[in-house]
Every structure is written in C-alpha cells, then in structure tokens.
C-alpha cells in the first residue's frame, strides 16, 4: 500500500457514496474500471473492503491499491487540499523557512501525473491552506529547489515572500553546501573535483555529459569526497558534494567513470543491466545541507541561518542493502 494513494474524506463529503467520492478524485477513470478495482478489493475504506453503496463519514480513510496517477485531473490551478493526507517529515521549521526529508517516490512539484500528491501540496496543507488557487495568490509557501522523484533527502522551503527571494538568490549562486550519498556498481576510484560539460534535451528530459566542451553545453563541477568499496556486493558507497546544481548532474556524471547509481534506469549502463533491474529507485540520497556565512546587508532574513547545518533523518534504503 502506498502512502501517496490514501485520502481523508473532508467534512463537505459527509454522507456521500464511496463510488461518487472516488470518481471525483479520479476524474479520468472509467466507471467500469473503478468498479472492477472495487470488486477486486483494491479500494479500501478504513482498511476494509466496502460495499458500493457505503456512505462516507468525515475523516474516513480511503486507500487505492493501484496506480492512480493516470486517472488524476491534470489542471492544478484550483485544488481542495483536503485530499492531501500525507504529512511532511520536518527536520527544522520556524516562521521563515522549513527543512524537510522527502521520501523516495514523491515528486517535489505538481505535474500532469502527480497533481494532488506532491511535496508542494503537502507543504500548503501543513501551513494551514485548505484550498489552493494559484491564480488568486501573490505568494504561497513553496520549496526553493527540488530533487528527483526517486531521490530521497533534504529539501528546503520558504514560508514568506522575503525568505523565498533570498533562498532563490542563494541557490542561484550555488552558495549552499549540498552533500549526497550514493551507491554505485563496481569500485569507484575517482575522488576529488571532477569537471565536465552538461547539456539537457528538453524534449525528453535526458542530459548528456562529456569531458570536453561541446555546442550549447555548460560546465559542471562535482566533488567526490569519499568511497567505500563493499567487495561482497561489488558496490561502492560514495559521498558527493554538489558544486554546480544541474538536472541529473550526479547521475549522468557517474556514467563517465563507467559506474552508475544502483537502480538508475534512465542513465543505466549495459554491463549492469541484469543487476540493475531488481531495484525500484536509484540509490541517491541528499543527506546534508549547510548555509554559508551570509551578509546581513544582502540577506537580512537568511543571515540568521549563517553556517547552520541540516542533516537528513532518513536512513536511505540502499544502506540496508549493504549491511
């Protein structure tokens, strides 16, 4: 059962039939398909199989035991946040910023496939929003950056407009220290600063990384701090400090060394195909974030967080793999 597929019944849906409520949540599903899932026990009400004519009560829990993303509405301009049940895993929070741990399998921002369950909507719900209309709000709490859906770890957000502007400036200039843990196939022997050239294909979302400059490519820098080889698994646990912050930078860069992240399907290498297929997520975890020393004149809000260090409280799945 996936957490992302659970919903709480809001007060305004009290006494509604379960099929009517579910068909509103999943507007793109065929009625026949929904009733098939209901019949097969893939729709649960408070952890039990309901009858089709069951009437709902406030705070009833509905769980879908199938992938609901193809059936969700893609227009996210207006959203009832009562449908968002998941809670943030908070590392730090005050009146200006919030630092959270993102689990694997959840996207940071809404997209066509994840219009309801995403980290952004969880933040809005946490901050007391019951409804969200992006056309009517000048500012709303939001995250200043994102990590991949199948990467876990630290994400930082802003709760005020001033804090967001300063965070955006800090990220734009790569001032924050961002460290990751990763698990790669084979022995990794490329410690230290590595520079390469990066380009993203916006049509398919794939990035290309090469050692030498090529047309429209941008220079990237990655510092590989530590590597521990686990001989019985033929894998290496590595620590990475991200200097520039380009899309899929770590994942694509590792291919240059004929290594790849365990579980990475997008940037997989043929020699690891058979071993790689058994893993659902890529073995990458954002485990530490450190603020630099910030000047009060330039960062009147964030100066209070100068040199603050935040560490993830999640133990990534791949560390259990090598124990």
UniProtKB/Swiss-Prot annotation:
Q: Does the keyword Isomerase apply?
A: yes
E.C. number(s) listed in UniProt: 5.4.99.-
Q: Which intervals hold domain S4 RNA-binding?
A: 16-95
Q: Which reaction does it catalyse?
A: a uridine in RNA = a pseudouridine in RNA
Pfam families (alphabetical): PseudoU_synth_2
Alphabetized, the UniProt keywords read:
Isomerase, RNA-binding
> Which molecular function terms from Gene Ontology are attached?
catalytic activity, acting on RNA; pseudouridine synthase activity; RNA binding
The chain's coiled-coil residues are none
Q: GO annotations under biological process?
A: enzyme-directed rRNA pseudouridine synthesis
Per its UniProt entry, what is the enzyme's top EC class, as one word?
A: isomerase
Q: Known InterPro entries for this protein?
A: PsdUridine_synth_cat_dom_sf (IPR020103), PsdUridine_synth_RluA-like_CS (IPR006224), PsdUridine_synth_RluC/D (IPR006225), PsdUridine_synth_RsuA/RluA (IPR006145), RluA_PseudoU_synthase (IPR050188), S4_RNA-bd_sf (IPR036986)
Q: Does the keyword RNA-binding apply?
A: yes
Q: Which residues form the active site?
A: 148
Protein family membership: Belongs to the pseudouridine synthase RluA family.
Q: Give the PANTHER family listed for this entry.
A: MITOCHONDRIAL RNA PSEUDOURIDINE SYNTHASE (PTHR21600), RIBOSOMAL LARGE SUBUNIT PSEUDOURIDINE SYNTHASE D (PTHR21600:SF44)
Q: What is this protein called?
A: Uncharacterized RNA pseudouridine synthase MG370
Please tell me the species this chain comes from: Mycoplasma genitalium (strain ATCC 33530 / DSM 19775 / NCTC 10195 / G37)
